[in-house]
């Protein structure tokens, strides 16, 4: 979340910057609440001082043998007023906190200004889409022809937006995840982690999915115990490793990677990508997270994005990189790059990774800090996250870009060691 001090001291400037994201900050309401808070706080502090003085005078009156009943009554009355004032302060602060938790991050000055995805800016492209000399099939047709992809059985088991992978495609899916993990740990310096797939609410508050995006989550309610949520991304569990910690500066940067399933309700996706594996309730993803010193986070974003790009380059999959505009960025991001891979059957690029610098936005929620060696004082870290990559969408891209006229699929060179040396499936 944003720094409340920044909000108080530069409210209109913050509102103007948020407007570029299409977010209307209720300046009048915040100003009114702040005025109430100051008034009640001043009154409460004065009342506390008066009560302390009156309490002291009770002892003095006792020593003089005076009737202390009126003083006792005053102290009791002031105590009741203090309790009332503190309760009022708590209510005001609760409303301010509620507003604060609903405010998105401020965009970095380098982020292009725009209302929606049309305002995104293409930064670069890599590779050239294959010019097929035969009628191409989409991944669904390729998979169902051989019985490798079974959406009918998946629907019988779980409903819409699930997939059952079998045989060579299941193996190819596993190979992709193993390849990605090995690349990031072996060449990019990430520490592999195996994390819980179920987390409690504070973890999701820390990474900003709660309270604003609860409808996108799958929730498990347990009688007498804390609710649990299925992770929408390993970003949640990986980033929260440092929640509540004060790290030594020598520990930074921390770089974590994990291969996990992800679970999303896709509440706002009705009618979109209903065919195939592009948009699922359950999908696998290899997630990268970095925890860094504030001065290095923008440079770290470039490195994180390059790590994700390397996966696509080694797989020889054409892609492009977009700098997301202010109106299309995620809630907690300062700056985001999207990687989009070429999907031949759709004749367009589709998102396969989103790499974001969240600045101190998540760290403030989590109270994740490091000790500044120059001042000796704790300061908030910066957090970054990115897909490296979404495994299911990468599988889609491999199937379609490596298809042959007879419906078989060539195995990318870097995956052959994970496929027992197979060169073609189908």
Curated annotation (Swiss-Prot):
CDD domains: SerRS_core
Keyword Nucleotide-binding listed: yes
Keyword set, alphabetical order: Aminoacyl-tRNA synthetase, ATP-binding, Cytoplasm, Ligase, Nucleotide-binding, Protein biosynthesis
PROSITE patterns: AA_TRNA_LIGASE_II
EC number: 6.1.1.11
Catalytic activity: tRNA(Ser) + L-serine + ATP = L-seryl-tRNA(Ser) + AMP + diphosphate + H(+); tRNA(Sec) + L-serine + ATP = L-seryl-tRNA(Sec) + AMP + diphosphate + H(+)
GO cellular component, one term: cytoplasm
Localization: Cytoplasm
Domain of life (superkingdom): Bacteria
Record: residues binding L-serine: 233-235, 287, 387
Subunit architecture: Homodimer. The tRNA molecule binds across the dimer.
UniProt name for this protein: Serine--tRNA ligase
Entry remark concerning the domains of this protein: Consists of two distinct domains, a catalytic core and a N-terminal extension that is involved in tRNA binding.
EC main group: ligase
Region named Disordered: 41-64
UniProt feature, compositional bias: Polar residues: 41-60
HAMAP family hit by this protein: Ser_tRNA_synth_type1
């Amino acid at each position: 979340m944003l720094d409340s001090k920044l909000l108080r001291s530069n409210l209109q400037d913050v509102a103007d910057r948020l407007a570029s994201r299409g977010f209307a900050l209720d300046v009048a309401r915040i100003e009114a609440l702040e005025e109430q808070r100051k008034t009640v706080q001043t009154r409460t502090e004065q009342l506390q001082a008066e009560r302390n003085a009156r309490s002291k005078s009770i002892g003095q009156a006792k020593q003089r043998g005076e009737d202390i009943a009126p003083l006792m009554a005053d102290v009791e009355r002031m105590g009741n007023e203090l309790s009332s004032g503190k309760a009022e302060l708590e209510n005001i602060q609760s409303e301010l906190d509620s507003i604060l938790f609903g405010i998105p991050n401020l965009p970095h000055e380098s982020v292009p200004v725009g209302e929606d995805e049309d305002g995104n800016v293409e930064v670069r492209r890599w590779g050239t889409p294959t010019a097929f000399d035969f009628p191409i099939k989409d991944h669904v047709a390729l998979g169902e022809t051989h019985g490798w992809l079974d959406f009918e059985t998946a629907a019988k088991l779980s409903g819409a937006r699930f997939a059952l992978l079998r045989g060579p495609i299941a193996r190819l899916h596993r190979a992709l995840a193993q390849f990605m993990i090995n690349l990031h740990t072996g060449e990019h310096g990430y520490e592999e982690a195996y994390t819980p797939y179920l987390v409690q609410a504070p973890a999701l508050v820390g990474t900003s999915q709660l309270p604003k995006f609860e409808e996108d989550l799958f929730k498990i309610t347990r009688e007498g115990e804390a609710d649990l949520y299925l992770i929408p991304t390993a970003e949640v569990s990986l980033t929260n490793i440092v929640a509540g910690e004060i790290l030594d500066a020598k520990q930074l940067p921390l770089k974590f990677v994990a291969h996990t399933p992800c679970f999303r309700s896709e509440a706002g996706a009705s009618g979109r990508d209903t065919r195939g594996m592009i948009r699922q309730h359950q999908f696998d993803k290899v997630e990268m997270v970095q925890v860094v010193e504030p001065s290095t986070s923008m440079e770290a974003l470039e490195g994180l994005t390059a790590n994700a790009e390397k996966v696509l380059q080694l797989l020889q999959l054409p892609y492009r990189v977009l700098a997301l505009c202010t109106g299309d960025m995620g809630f907690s991001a300062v700056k985001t790059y999207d990687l989009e891979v070429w999907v031949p059957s759709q004749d367009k690029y589709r998102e396969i990774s989103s790499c974001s610098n969240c600045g101190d936005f998540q760290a403030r929620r989590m109270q994740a800090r490091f000790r500044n060696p120059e001042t000796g004082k704790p300061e908030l870290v910066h957090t970054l996250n990115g897909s490296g990559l979404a495994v299911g969408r990468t599988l889609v891209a491999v199937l379609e870009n490596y298809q042959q006229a007879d419906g078989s699929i060539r195995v990318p060179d870097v995956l052959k060691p994970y496929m027992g040396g197979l060169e073609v499936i189908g």
